[in-house]
């Protein structure tokens, strides 16, 4: 699947950038493990803190306050921000809770619980200014029998899902629906 994304980017003469939080650079690592990725991979941002998201890729403070760092709105701003900062054609933003405990965040001033395994992934394509936001939630109970590896399962699944979303978005943006 990763090879397919790199091949598609090369075929379409497009560049990609990533902005990752809960995956901690795993997506960028997967992309750059494919021979020839240097022709299409521009930047990989690991923006774990809110400050890094604001400073490096332009996530709006108001968006963080109104929606929290764990939201589709922030994932979308991460995708657009990394794409613009890198001068790329495609941007992917990933944010979420990969840990085993719920996170309490403020959403418009109201304390809100975000469950473990809640991951927001956004992909945008510069060709037509379109942005697709997909929400994927990986359930802790489904992974419980595996043991202590829940965090790694979330990170792996989120980065793989981001690759799938990118392929779909590039095909949609370039009006190429061939599989």
For each predicted feature, which ranges?
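Short alpha-helical segments enriched in small residues
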Residues: 1-179
């Amino acid at each position: 699947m990763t090879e397919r994304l790199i091949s598609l980017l090369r075929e379409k003469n497009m560049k990609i950038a990533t902005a990752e939080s809960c995956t901690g650079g795993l997506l960028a690592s997967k992309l750059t493990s494919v021979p020839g990725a240097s022709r299409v991979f521009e930047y990989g941002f690991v923006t774990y803190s809110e400050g890094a998201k604001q400073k490096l890729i332009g996530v709006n403070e108001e968006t963080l306050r109104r929606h929290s760092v764990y939201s589709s709105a922030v994932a979308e701003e991460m995708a657009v921000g990394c794409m613009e900062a890198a001068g790329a054609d495609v941007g992917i933003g990933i944010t979420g809770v990969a840990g085993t405990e719920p996170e309490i965040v403020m959403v418009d001033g109201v304390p809100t619980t975000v469950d473990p395994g809640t991951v927001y992934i956004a992909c945008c394509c510069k060709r037509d200014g379109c942005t697709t936001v997909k929400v994927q939630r990986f359930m802790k109970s489904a992974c419980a029998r595996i043991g202590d590896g829940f965090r790694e399962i979330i990170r792996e699944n989120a980065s793989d899902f981001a690759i799938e979303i990118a392929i779909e978005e590039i095909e949609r943006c370039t009006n190429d629906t061939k599989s």
